[in-house]
Amino acid sequence: VGVQKAIDLIGTGNSIQDAVTEALDRARLSLEGITSFEVQRISGVVDGSTAGYEVQLRIWFTLLERMHG
C-alpha cells in the first residue's frame, strides 16, 4: 500500500467542468499516480454578460517508492 499525498489547486474556466478539467490537466503535467479529487470551493466572477468560474480542488496522488543506492 502506497502513501497518499494531497495538494490544493485552483482551476478557472467558462464553466465549472472546464475549471475542474483545467486543474486536473495541469496536475497531470507534473504529478504521477493521481487517484482522486474533491471540489473544495466553487466561485464565480461576472464581467458584463460573461461569467467565469473558479474551482478549488484537493487532488490526491500516490507517492512513488524509489530505491536509492
Language-model-derived ranges and their functions:
Residues E38-G69:
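A cross-kingdom feature marking charged/low-complexity
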Residues G2-F37:
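Short, well-ordered alpha-helical segments
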